[in-house]
């Protein structure tokens, strides 16, 4: 056999062996390892679904609509109608887009009217959708600005509703990453069980 043919066969064997090792490692070992780690923390690996009376009502990780003035409202969604998770994504409108500016002004007027505040007092995250369009959190400022509306609609004192907001405010991740947040689903579930 010629030297060129021997080298070609050796390289082909090496390439085939690399393909088999990569297929086994990335197609079997890695997925099984991720699955095993997920089984160690099943509540976190299964989407953090929240159940009430055995029925799933939402996920701590995905925003959803709460129609009615008696509920805290999440950020606006760019994910289709009704927080459609299959349409998750940003609006892709730039900061100088007239469509974005028009949407922000419409949201500002609607939120100000619903919460009974001046348009300049609307929290910034009540005006813009998150990158995914399905953010389950609002800022503590946004939640606090909704307290009066929610308290009046539910017949609760503003102090009681404000205390629920404070109880459900989470600090920065690791103490320094990101901003404090309020999970809207968790807050609304606590609100649901709050006695007037």
From Swiss-Prot:
Q: Note the InterPro entries from the entry.
A: KdpC
Q: Where are the transmembrane segments?
A: 17-37
Main location group: membrane
Where does the record say this protein resides? Cell membrane
What's in the keyword line of the UniProt record? ATP-binding, Cell membrane, Ion transport, Membrane, Nucleotide-binding, Potassium, Potassium transport, Transmembrane, Transmembrane helix, Transport
Q: How does it assemble?
A: The system is composed of three essential subunits: KdpA, KdpB and KdpC.
Q: Cellular component terms, GO, for this chain's entry?
A: plasma membrane
Bilayer topology term: Single-pass membrane protein
The record's function comment reads: Part of the high-affinity ATP-driven potassium transport (or Kdp) system, which catalyzes the hydrolysis of ATP coupled with the electrogenic transport of potassium into the cytoplasm. This subunit acts as a catalytic chaperone that increases the ATP-binding affinity of the ATP-hydrolyzing subunit KdpB by the formation of a transient KdpB/KdpC/ATP ternary complex.
Which cysteines pair up through disulfides? They are none
Q: Name one GO molecular function term.
A: P-type potassium transmembrane transporter activity
The segment annotated Disordered runs over: 73-93
Lineage: superkingdom: Bacteria
Supply the name of the protein.
Answer: Potassium-transporting ATPase KdpC subunit
Q: Which organism is it from?
A: Kineococcus radiotolerans (strain ATCC BAA-149 / DSM 14245 / SRS30216)
Q: Which family does it belong to?
A: Belongs to the KdpC family.
């Amino acid at each position: 056999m010629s030297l060129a043919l021997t080298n070609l066969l050796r390289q082909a064997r090496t390439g085939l062996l690399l393909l088999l090792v990569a297929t086994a490692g990335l197609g079997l070992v890695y997925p099984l390892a991720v699955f095993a780690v997920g089984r160690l923390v099943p509540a976190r690996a299964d989407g953090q679904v929240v159940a009430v009376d055995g029925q799933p009502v939402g996920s701590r990780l995905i925003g959803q609509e709460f129609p009615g003035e008696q509920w805290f409202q999440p950020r606006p969604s760019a994910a289709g109608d009704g927080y459609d998770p299959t349409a998750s994504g940003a609006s892709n409108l730039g900061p100088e887009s007239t469509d974005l500016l028009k949407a922000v002004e419409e949201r500002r007027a609607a939120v100000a009217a619903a919460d009974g505040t001046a348009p300049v007092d609307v929290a910034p995250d009540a005006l813009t959708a998150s990158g995914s369009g399905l953010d389950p959190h609002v800022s503590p400022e946004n939640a606090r600005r909704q307290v009066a509306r929610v308290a009046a609609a539910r017949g609760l004192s503003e102090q009681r509703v404000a205390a629920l907001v404070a109880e459900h405010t989470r600090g920065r991740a690791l103490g320094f990453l990101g901003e404090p947040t309020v999970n809207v689903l968790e807050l609304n579930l606590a609100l649901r069980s709050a006695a007037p």
